[in-house]
Design a protein with these regions (language model features):
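GHKL-family ATPase ATP-binding module
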Residues: 1-14, 21, 43-45, 53-55, ...
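Conserved short strand/loop->alpha-helix "switch" segment adjacent to the catalytic nucleotide/phosphoryl-transfer site
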Residues: 26-45
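C-terminal interaction appendages of subunits in large macromolecular complexes
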Residues: 388-407, 422-427, 438, 442-444, ...
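Short adenine-binding "F-helix/F-box" segment of the Bergerat
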Residues: 87-88, 95
Length: 648
C-alpha cells in the first residue's frame, strides 16, 4: 500500500449517515438475520468487521476478542481509532454517530475504505441498539476517550479520560436478554469464524479468549494467524485427506483494481469442495467469482489434456464436473461495490468479476501445468477416472429415478407413508432397524408422519465412489421416499427438490454409541449429497429420553444425567438405589405409546434442527471423522476422549 493511500484522512468528514436506528429494537431479525444463537454471534462479527476493515486499509495488525464471565464481549484492535471530532451534519461526536446511527461509518466513504466487510453493513450501531450496555473506548491522537450507552442511547457525551500511547478502538457489549432467545456465546462458533478471517487476511493476528472457567477451572484461548493466507487455509481443509498432488497452487494477484486470491489442490476423494468469499463474506451460494474460477479450471485443464493426447488415449468424454472431483479450493475476491443476490443474499452478482477471476486463474494454472508436468498428468488421470465413474453413476442414478415416487409404485416397500400429501405438513422419520421401525409405525400420527426403517448402518459416503453411493439399497430408499432426484436444468449434479414429499426429515436412532454413529453416517450423506435439505432447515434429529425414573406414583422421563440426578435428589433424598431408574439404550425398549409421548408428539417432543454454521469447518470435520486418513481422527479422539460418555 502506498504512503499516499496511508495518508487518506480519516476524520468526522469520512463518516456518512444513511438512516436512523429506531427500527432495530422493534424488528431485530431484519437487521441481523434472527434473534437466536446465529443472531447473537452475528453481533460479534459486526464489531470484528470494523477491525478487519482497518486491517484491509493497512492500519490494524492485532484484534483481541474476549468472552467475559457474564457473557459480555470485548473486541479491541490497534487501528487508528474511530474519529471523535465534531460531526458537522449530526452536531455530535463522530464516535457517537458511528455508535448510534444505522449505516453510519467510514465504509460508505470510498476514500476511507476501498473495500469493506459486512454483508448487510448494519454496523456497530446495530450491536449497540441490541445491547443493554455498550462501552466504546478510543485511543487516538495521544488521548483516550470513552462513551457508554444503554439500548443504543448514550448515557453521556464522549469524554476524554486520559492519555494514550497507542491507537485503536475497544467495544464491550452485553446482548439484551429480552430480545435474544439465546445469550450464551459458544466458543467454537466464534473460533471457526475468526479462524476463517485470519486465513482470509494474511498477517492479521486474532486472539480469542474465553474467561468463563469450566468445571476444572480452566479457560480457553486461541491465536489465529496466517502468514500465507489461503494457501494455509487449503492445507488446513485438506489435512484430513490423502493428497493427490503435493502442492497447493496459490494465486494472489490484482486484476483491474480487483484483488483476487485463489488457493487450490487435489486429493484422492470424490468430493468437490469450493469455498468462496467476497470481502471476507462467505458466499455460500457462489456467484460470478465461482463461475469464473470453474470456467478457467475447465478450459485450462481440458486444453492440457488435449494437447498432451491423454484424452485421445483414454477414449472417454469429459465434462466440467470431472475436473472438480477431488478438488479443494478457496476463492477470495475484494470488490469495491459488491452486488449480492440469491435466497440468502450470499451470491455475488457482479458480472465483471467472472472475467477477472477467469483471467487470473487461467494464466496462473497454465503456468503451473507447464512447470509441473508430473502433477499435471496426475490431475488429468484423476479427471479421466472421474469421467468413467460419472458414467457408471449415471446408470445407477437412472435406476434410482426410473419410477416416479409421486405415482406411489416406486416407493420403498418398508416405507410406512402418511396420508397427507402436503409436504409442509409431512414428516419422514428415518429409524434405525425394523424393531424400532415397527414401534414407531404403531405410535405415529398416520396423517402426517411417515416411517422409513433403515437396515443397520448406511454406507459411509465419505469413502465411496459416486456410483457406489447410488447402488446402496438404503440410500436408494432415502432418495425414493423423499421424492428428490439428481440433476436440474442448471446443474447435472444438483439436488432437484421440486417433488420433495416432506418438509421435516427426522433422524431417530437409539440413544447409544451405535445410534450416534448412525446419526453421523446419515448426516455425512446429507451434507455431501443433499446439502440443500440442511440449508433449507428440513433436517432434524430426534431426542428420545435416556431414562425413565420412578418413585412410588411419581414417574418422570429424563433426557440428561443432570435431570436424572435432580429427580434422585428430589424424590430419593440423593440415594439413587431408592429410585427405580430405567435406562433406554434402544428405541425398541419403549412401547409405542411411550415413543409417541416422549419423542414423536409435536406437542411436547424435542427436535434438534441441523444447521451449517460454517461450511468450511463442517467440510473439515466430516472429512476428519469419516474419511480414509486415520491420523487426524486418532488425534481428535485422543484430544477429546475425556469428554466421551461411555455406554455401560
Amino acid at each position: 500500500m502506498s504512503e499516499q493511500n496511508k495518508e487518506t484522512s480519516y476524520s468526522a468528514k469520512s463518516i456518512q449517515v444513511l438512516e436512523g436506528l429506531e427500527a432495530v429494537r422493534k424488528r431485530p431479525a431484519m437487521y441481523i438475520g434472527d434473534i437466536s444463537e446465529r443472531g447473537l454471534h452475528h453481533l460479534v462479527y459486526e464489531v470484528v468487521d470494523n477491525s478487519i476493515d482497518e486491517a484491509l486499509a493497512g492500519y490494524c495488525k492485532n484484534i483481541l476478542v474476549d468472552i467475559w464471565e457474564d457473557n459480555s464481549i470485548s473486541v479491541e484492535d490497534d487501528g487508528r481509532g474511530i474519529p471523535v471530532d465534531f460531526h458537522e451534519k449530526e452536531k455530535k461526536s463522530a464516535l457517537e454517530v458511528v455508535m448510534t446511527v444505522l449505516h453510519a461509518g467510514g465504509k460508505f466513504d470510498k476514500g476511507t475504505y476501498k473495500v469493506s466487510g459486512g454483508l448487510h453493513g448494519v454496523g456497530v450501531s446495530c450491536v449497540n441498539a441490541l445491547s443493554t450496555k455498550l462501552v466504546a473506548e478510543v485511543c487516538r491522537g495521544g488521548k483516550r476517550y470513552i462513551q457508554e450507552y444503554s439500548c443504543g442511547k448514550p448515557l453521556y457525551a464522549v469524554k476524554e479520560v486520559g492519555t494514550a500511547d497507542k491507537t485503536g478502538t475497544k467495544v464491550t457489549f452485553h446482548p439484551d436478554g429480552s430480545i435474544f432467545t439465546e445469550t450464551v456465546y459458544k466458543y467454537d462458533i466464534l473460533a471457526n469464524r475468526l479462524r476463517d478471517l485470519a486465513y482470509l487476511n494474511a498477517g492479521i493476528r486474532i486472539t480469542l479468549t474465553d474467561h468463563r472457567a469450566d468445571a476444572e477451572g480452566n479457560t480457553r484461548s486461541d491465536v489465529f494467524h496466517s502468514e500465507r493466507g489461503l494457501g494455509e487455509f487449503v492445507e488446513y481443509l485438506d489435512s484430513t485427506r490423502e493428497h493427490l498432488i503435493p502442492d497447493v497452487i496459490h494465486i494472489n494477484t490484482d486484476k483491474y483494481g480487483t484483488p483476487v486470491e485463489v488457493a487450490m489442490t487435489y486429493n484422492t476423494s470424490y468430493n468437490e469442495n469450493i469455498h468462496s468469499y467476497v470481502n471476507n463474506i462467505n458466499t455460500i451460494e457462489g456467484g460470478t467469482h465461482v463461475t469464473g474460477f470453474r470456467m478457467a479450471l475447465t478450459r485450462t485443464l481440458k486444453k492440457y489434456a488435449e494437447d498432451s493426447k491423454m484424452l485421445e488415449k483414454a477414449k472417454v468424454e469429459i465434462n466440467g464436473d470431472d475436473f472438480r472431483e477431488g478438488l479443494t479450493a478457496v476463492i477470495s475476491v475484494k470488490v469495491a461495490e459488491p452486488q449480492f443476490e440469491g435466497q440468502t443474499k450470499t451470491k455475488l452478482g457482479n458480472d465483471e468479476v467472472s472475467g477477472i477471476v477467469q483471467q487470473a486463474v487461467g494464466e496462473a494454472l497454465t503456468n503451473y501445468l507447464e512447470e509441473h508436468p508430473k502433477e499435471a498428468r496426475m490431475i488429468v488421470d484423476k479427471v479421466i477416472l472421474a469421467a468413467r465413474a460419472r458414467i457408471a453413476a449415471r446408470k445407477a442414478r437412472d435406476l434410482v429415478q426410473r419410477k416416479s415416487p409421486m405415482g406411489g409404485a416406486g416407493l420403498p416397500g418398508k416405507l410406512a407413508d402418511c396420508s397427507d400429501k402436503n409436504p409442509e405438513n409431512c414428516e419422514l422419520f428415518l429409524v434405525e432397524g425394523d424393531s424400532a421401525g415397527g414401534t414407531a409405525k404403531q405410535g405415529r400420527n398416520r396423517m402426517t408422519q411417515a416411517i422409513l426403517p433403515l437396515r443397520g448402518k448406511i454406507l459411509n459416503v465419505e469413502k465411496a465412489m459416486p456410483h457406489k453411493v447410488l447402488e446402496s439399497e438404503e440410500i436408494k430408499n432415502i432418495y425414493t421416499a423423499l421424492g428428490v432426484t439428481i440433476g436440474t436444468e442448471d446443474d447435472a449434479k444438483a439436488l432437484n427438490m421440486e417433488k420433495l414429499r416432506y418438509h421435516k426429515v427426522i433422524i431417530m436412532t437409539d440413544a447409544d454409541v451405535d445410534g450416534s454413529h448412525i446419526d453421523t453416517l446419515i448426516l455425512t450423506f446429507f451434507f455431501r449429497h443433499m446439502r440443500e435439505l440442511i440449508e433449507k432447515g428440513y433436517v432434524y434429529i430426534a431426542a428420545p429420553p435416556l431414562y425413565l425414573c420412578k418413585k412410588g406414583n411419581v414417574e418422570e422421563y429424563c433426557w440428561t444425567d443432570q435431570q436424572k440426578q435432580a429427580f434422585v435428589d428430589k424424590y430419593g433424598s440423593g440415594n439413587e438405589s431408592s429410585v427405580n431408574i430405567q435406562r433406554y439404550k434402544g428405541l425398541g425398549e419403549m412401547s409405542a405409546e411411550q415413543l409417541w409421548s416422549t419423542t414423536m408428539n409435536p406437542e411436547n417432543r424435542t427436535l434438534r434442527q441441523v444447521a451449517i454454521e460454517n461450511v468450511a469447518q463442517a467440510d473439515y470435520t466430516f472429512s476428519m471423522l469419516m474419511g480414509d486418513d486415520v491420523a487426524p481422527r486418532r488425534q481428535f479422539i485422543e484430544e477429546n476422549a475425556t469428554y466421551a460418555t461411555i455406554d455401560t
